[in-house]
Amino acid sequence: MAAIKALQEWCRQQCEGYRDVSITNMTTSFRDGLAFCAILHRHRPDLINFNALRKENIYENNKLAFQVAEEQLGIPALLDAEDMVALKIPDRLSILTYVSQYYNYFHGRSPIGGMAGMKRPSSDSTEELSGKKKVPSQPAKLSSPVPTQRLPLSPARTNPVVQRNEGVSERPSPKAAPGTVGSSVSSICGVCGKHVHLVQRHLADGRLYHRSCFRCKQCSSTLHSGAYRATGEPGVFVCTHHSSEAVSVSPKLSNLASRQPGGGIADTRPIGVSQKVLETNGEATPLRARTAAWEHAGGNRAAKGFVQTELTPPATSRVHVGSPAGPRLPMSTVTTTSANSKATTHVTNSSPVGWSSSAQSSTGTSGSRPVVSPSALGAHLSVPQGQAASKGVKTQLNSSTDSSSTAPTPAWTSSSSRTQQAREKFFHNLSPAPAPAPASSSSSHASRVPTVVTAPSGKVSPLVNTSTSKVPSATVVTVPTSKASTVVTAPTSKAPTVVTVPISKAPTVVTAPTSKVSTVVTVPTSKASTVVTAPTSKASTVVTVPTGRGHVVVNTSASKVSGVVDNPAQESSREQALSVLRKALPGLTRAGSQAPSRSSPATSSVLITLPKNEVPPKVPSAKLSHSTTQAFSPTPKMEPTAPLSVGSTSWTSVSLQAGKKSPGISPGIGKTSAVSRPQAEVKGTSGPGPTSQEGQEEGPEGWRARLKPVDKSIPSARALEQKEPVLAEPRAGDTPRKASSSSDSSIHITLTPIQQKRTPCLADSGSSLAAPSPPSRRKKLVVPPTLDVSADWLQPELKKQDDQTRSCKEKTATWGTRESSAILDNDLVSPDEAVTSPVRLHPNYISQEELQRQLQDIERQLDALELRGVELEKRLRAAEGDASEDGLMVDWFRLIHEKQLLLRRESELMYKSKDQCLEERQLDLQGELRRLMEKPEGLKSPQDRKREQELLNQYVNTVNDRSDIVDNLDEDRLREQEEDQMLESMIQNLGLQRKKSKSFLSKIWSSKSKSGQT
């Protein structure tokens, strides 16, 4: 009781002379708030105008005192103005603890909350103040002024008996359940919603928190005094080192997440519509902005934005092919433009891999195809899915291309001149030397699919099925025949290879319906200006071979066995030529028979395959590869390549030169015929060959002469096959191809038009490695046929080039690293320099790791003290008015003192950390400022002068901040010493009085016992 009376006496002395202030106890005497204001005015008259205060304004008086003490003196508000209004008898222990902070501060700084890191708002709104004025003093009619909590009133507020017995406003008594009875709004944590005891209290921004709950919003670490700041959101605090941008975004994200039941943002996309579709539509609006559009569009949104298809698109219109039911494929647009920008083809494809023909036709796009019976295969113009008609043939297509292929288009009249005119106009709009483009297809359903020949164009990618997603574009022109329809595709400038028309249910591209098949082959070369096709009879074959100077159209006719190009050669001559080839190339016969659908000529070649009833002799191909499932891609500098192969079980090939005239082709009739165009990829070089003006040699010597350049480039092609995965990797359009084995046999005939002064480079057009010179390479390739040419003879050169490239990259990386390090050295301080800096060499320097460790130790000690304080608080409230209260109060003050010591140490560490940062900042500013000042005035630019002034201002502010920290630390030490002395003396006096009382009672009892004995 002595300590409580001493504190009460101190308060009475401080409030002496102030009107309407009378300190008779430590409960009701402080209810109106004038006593708190009087103590503050006594020591700091500049903070409060006491004459303006009125006794009846309980809320305003208490609010003013608590606010000024917290903001100006750093004393945390353990009390709340609302509780002072609501309760007739305030909590005695809370008032004792709070007033003791006043006493400690004015005798030496030591508030429970430590430093005043966060300040409460300067004033609340006028509406809240007016509401507080109208609050009656009757506790039964009082409601909480804080609308967000909406907690029920405690019995301490409504029950006068509880008020009288407990005297509690914000603390529950041991006789009542904690957190329910005696709890008020001010005793509830703003984070966890649980009751806050006196020793745990931490008020920030007008809200009460557990010290352990008061954490950073960003890093979730406990906020220390002076090391946190408020944000725009109420009750949200962050560490001082966090950026303001990240803080401002986090509340919005949390609000968005809180709107959904699971804490996440619900997906507002329509059912069945993927996010990829939304992205391909080009919608840049956020998800919430798109919600309204989805509500109006409903399920048709995908059809409106994703598939843009017309029922009757013109031949030159931009065709969008796709379906909303497709499994999440983005819409891709292929735009091909010729060199003179006259012929342009737009193709848009979004069909996924594996779509069936029925699915394509059901989309209502231009991907539908006519169904033609085997008996009446008319010549139709059909635009497959992913293809668009070229503008160059608009006049020839007329109205037949206007339909979207729900019904087949009418057949053309068989007119080769008409086709010739269309081709001339088309190739006139294209570049004069289009690069080669291979084509590929498989054969099946021979009775329902026509034979198709595709012409190459530009940069190529392998021909894929119409049911695949990568569909190239070309112009498709058909020519009627008697028994089978033939489709000829014209090339575009830089478009991928062409997909043929899907007929009936055949998943493959091209087949021949019967053994009596008419075939139209169009093979343009790099300088070809015209392509002419002509209708044929039952078993006739028309092959058009444009050369550098023109084109040759040859009609051949045979019964069921042969089809001949141009002038028919004797059968004996053909056999002699084949025997010469076998003798000249003995080592390649096996490879040619095992690898039918690969071709890698040194120059551009055309591989034409016709069916044959019986298996021909194994003739080695000059440029056949080992697999039909891999693809190469030629360079743009090479000649156009259009290899055509008939799917069969056995394959042979004959390489011919088409630079002179069209040679003979081995005839044959097969069950089915498929058109495939293996991609040729050449690594070697080819020297000048015969020009197109030379006459054709029909004998075996001419064949051998024409085959020599091809023979020389064989090792390079074989070596290229070993490097195929690396060279063919950049081409995403390359797809595996397999030849169908529906026919008995077939034969490959390669037409190789050779032009002078052609030097092909590496197959990879994007490669930066240059090929060796043609003469030296040609000399290396002249080797005996019996010599075993290793497939990896080019590897040393490639390794050397790879090493050069790797070393160049390493040098670049090293240079970039050195440059980066140089930049860092100019702008930042390296770790070695930071260690040797004067700040870190200071004997009192504390590293950040050590600071964090000490702060964690203080945190643990504070947690232990809070547990002790909670138990001691319960005992104090239970022993109110008892003889043991005095001893418990002494323990309480000691516990508060220990907590104050820990908070002091925490404040010192925070001061120390801030001071070290300022010192390092000061050194940096000083160095930069000296460099600017050492520069002559005549050489200084306006930017230098401006920067110098800014640095000078920053330097002065830094020095002032450091001085303030030192002054605050000195003042704190002095106040702490005085406080410790006052507290120790008070405790000692309390202990002496207790000892005296005990000794006095013992003397009385001892005297009584002595008198009784006598």
Swiss-Prot record:
Subcellular location: Cell membrane; Cell junction, Tight junction; Recycling endosome; Cell projection, Neuron projection
List of residues that carry Phosphothreonine: 759
Gene3D superfamilies: Calponin-like domain, Cysteine Rich Protein
Domain bMERB, first and last residues per copy: 838-985
Domain topic, free-text comment: Exists in a closed and an open conformation due to interaction of the C-terminal coiled-coil domain with an N-terminal region including the calponin-homology (CH) and the LIM zinc-binding domain. The conformational change is regulated by RAB13 and RAB8A. Adopts its closed form upon interaction with RAB8A and interaction with RAB13 causes conformational change from closed to open.
Function in brief: Effector of small Rab GTPases which is involved in junctional complexes assembly through the regulation of cell adhesion molecules transport to the plasma membrane and actin cytoskeleton reorganization. Regulates the endocytic recycling of occludins, claudins and E-cadherin to the plasma membrane and may thereby regulate the establishment of tight junctions and adherens junctions. In parallel, may regulate actin cytoskeleton reorganization directly through interaction with F-actin or indirectly through actinins and filamins.
The name this protein goes by in its record: MICAL-like protein 2
Source species: Rattus norvegicus (Rat)
Gene expressing this chain: Micall2
